[in-house]
Amino acid sequence: MGGLMVSFYQAFRFINVYLQYPIVVTLQMDQKQFLDFPAVTVCNLNRIKEKYLRCIHSNVSLDLCYVQGFLPVDNTKPNLIMSERTGLHSCTSEFRGNSDAEKDFTIQFLKTYLALNSKNRKKVGYGSKEFITLCSFNGKLCSAKDFTEFQNLRYGNCFTFNQLYQNESKPLTISQTGDQSGLVLVLDLLDLYYLNISSTIGARIIIHDPKEEPSPEETGINIAPGYETSVALTQTAVTRLPAPYRDHCGEYKNENIWPYHKSLNRCVRNCIQYNSFEVCGCADPTLPSMTSQKLCNLTDKSEMCCLDDILLLLLEENRTCDCPLPCSSISYGEKVSVARWPSASSFFTGEAEYTYYPFQFRKSRKSQAKLKIFYSSLTQKNYVQRPMFHESEIYSHLGGELGIWLGMSLMVTFEIFEIVCMLVKILINFLLRCSSNE
């Protein structure tokens, strides 16, 4: 009897662990002959050209603005970093009278910019042909036509190389390593068009999975003019298990349907907007939202504080968004190095050019940036989640416990169970016959 109780106790402990669905993570290093090249998104840190600022504040047609040559606004205001709403408002300071003219100016600009439709936002931003002045991939020339455009509220017009959509099957691949392979870009930042509230001159670079949309606010690096920035990449793949295992991973589909959870970041943003609209009656104007949702007023104290309260509530453990990790994801390790560019010896080809072209050299260093993105290794690092136990191991474990403590195999146990069932059946039939005879 003691052995039977111990075997049942051990079996109970095993089943309890099994129902927690533990996992093991395996690491594999796969040396590839060809490796998929990532998507590369580039954005200017200045989302709108300064020459259009007077026009959008005065509600002047952008076409007339360009023809009539409206002067830009006064440049005497101090520089500010372009930020989202949370970087401009705080219920504990600004709305108690501690706001300053700098933030007020930035808030007014954001209100005006967010009121523009997508067509006008595209007009006042940078075009791909003027922004991307040189492009090559694996030594072959490419152009601005090889980039897809999308709009971002913080960075304006952004451009993506090697972006995949549902009707496309495979991204570009690469078979060589080193800075002589991969993608090479020369970007013209057009610093003369920068707003006085854009305190940093440069470009935002996002390296991401070709099947995923970029998130410039959450990921990416900034590059500066006058430098060649080299980014050496390594690739890591992660495969997770769905429910009931601990990560409860999900699949994000690349669909333009609300809520269009193309990615984990988009899912979180949609969750924030949904809760904001439900509680505050309006959505955060600096995040993507449904066209039917009313946008909050950036200068309204109650609405801004309500949006802050929503973020605090969502940070609590019991109010998390239902946004699981993706079941499969690709990430890239980035090792960044920089060097001055261009050098005087490469820019000038003769003594005469030193006399006639010093201005162009200074302008190039002030406004242009060079970017190299390549793989440092074709080894893919794979992390794969696997179940620690399979269903068949339940029977194996039960049989093992019975064998250790009772000296019985699982087959013998089933035979005993079958005999007991037959005896019970015979006893029931006997009792039924006895009752009928009486």
Each language-model region and where it sits:
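Long, solvent-exposed, non-transmembrane segments immediately flanking or lying between transmembrane helices
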Residues: 1-317, 321, 334-341, 345-346
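Long, compositionally biased charged/polar accessory segments in the mid-to-C-terminal portions
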Residues: 263, 272-438
